[in-house]
Amino acid sequence: MEGDLAYIGAGLAGMGTGIAALGVGNVAANFLAGALRNPSAAASQTATLFIGIAFAEALGIFSFLVALLLMFAV
């Protein structure tokens, strides 16, 4: 029974990886919308874009690691 609950928890934590992908898409879409409105400011904002993508992707990686820990360590 405890093993089954670990797999359910791992599945729920694994959904965080997909949600992080949605977050990365949202960051990129908003950057593109802003860059199309003001092309002269787009070049100075690319570093901010990459930082935002890195933070969103880091949350996905952390949720993936939690899922792996729940599956194999618990």
UniProtKB/Swiss-Prot annotation:
Cellular localisation: Cell inner membrane
Statement: the UniProt record of this protein carries the keyword Cell inner membrane: yes
InterPro entries (UniProt xref): ATP_synth_F0_csu (IPR000454), ATP_synth_F0_csu_sf (IPR038662), ATPase_proteolipid_c-like_dom (IPR002379), F/V-ATP_Csub_sf (IPR035921)
Coiled coil region boundaries: none
Topology versus the membrane: Multi-pass membrane protein
Cross-referenced SUPFAM superfamilies: F1F0 ATP synthase subunit C (SSF81333)
Lineage of the organism: Bacteria, Pseudomonadati, Pseudomonadota, Alphaproteobacteria, Rhodobacterales
Oligomeric and partner information: F-type ATPases have 2 components, F(1) - the catalytic core - and F(0) - the membrane proton channel. F(1) has five subunits: alpha(3), beta(3), gamma(1), delta(1), epsilon(1). F(0) has three main subunits: a(1), b(2) and c(10-14). The alpha and beta chains form an alternating ring which encloses part of the gamma chain. F(1) is attached to F(0) by a central stalk formed by the gamma and epsilon chains, while a peripheral stalk is formed by the delta and b chains.
GO molecular function: lipid binding; proton-transporting ATP synthase activity, rotational mechanism
Record-given protein name: ATP synthase subunit c
Organism: Ruegeria sp. (strain TM1040) (Silicibacter sp.)
One GO term describing the cellular component: proton-transporting ATP synthase complex
Entry's family note: Belongs to the ATPase C chain family.
Site, as annotated: Reversibly protonated during proton transport: 57
UniProt keyword annotations, A-Z: ATP synthesis, Cell inner membrane, Cell membrane, CF(0), Hydrogen ion transport, Ion transport, Lipid-binding, Membrane, Transmembrane, Transmembrane helix, Transport
Keyword Transmembrane helix: yes
